Amino acid sequence: FMRLRRLGVSAGHAWNGSWEAIAASSDDRPYEVKMREQLALIAGDQLLASAYGALLRNAVDDRLTIKDVTAKLSDADKTLVPDVEPTADALLERISALANGLERLQRDLPTDALTQLELRVASVQAEPEQAPDRERRLTLLTRQLSSLQELVSRREMMQRQLDSASMALRSLRLDIVKLRTMGVGAAISDVTNATQEARALSKDLGYVISAADEMRKL
């Protein structure tokens, strides 16, 4: 609470939930500091060093911009776009979860794993039927191929979802900046539409991620 007091947040604001906007508008720390802090909350060093690091940094940049712009809106304008902040938070959470899952799959599944396994299956299939242990090996390899194909399909689906969530967050950022630049009257429709679409996408992704988590527990 003392940290909030230093940012100009009173006890009343802390209790009624308006402290976040006040704290955001009072946060004059360098951008790089806020960027590092937010990244540390959603990703470890290994993930940030992976192929998804740049995407995560862009997502955090979008989120910080949205937070900065909405913090500077008047109270009256904020009431017109109440869902922007929670929607942006939900999208960033989904992006982080999907990037984490994809990074793990990338480590566990070599790029050429499917091709190599298909070649092994074809090689065993080409053996004479009387070849020693042919049927057992073919059954085992076919089962492995089916499992690997399922994992590759899941990876492709997660990549599409990650791209969609990233684009939704970027659209929300652009529309909220447009609102600040052109005024609420000119941009409110764009922001509302972007928020509704992003909220629906975030909800759908939440179901998918939760289902995947449950499957891993089985």
Place the predicted regions along the sequence by residue:
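Membrane-proximal, non-transmembrane interface segments of integral membrane proteins
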Residues: M2-P128
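Long amphipathic all-alpha helical oligomerization modules
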Residues: Q125-L218
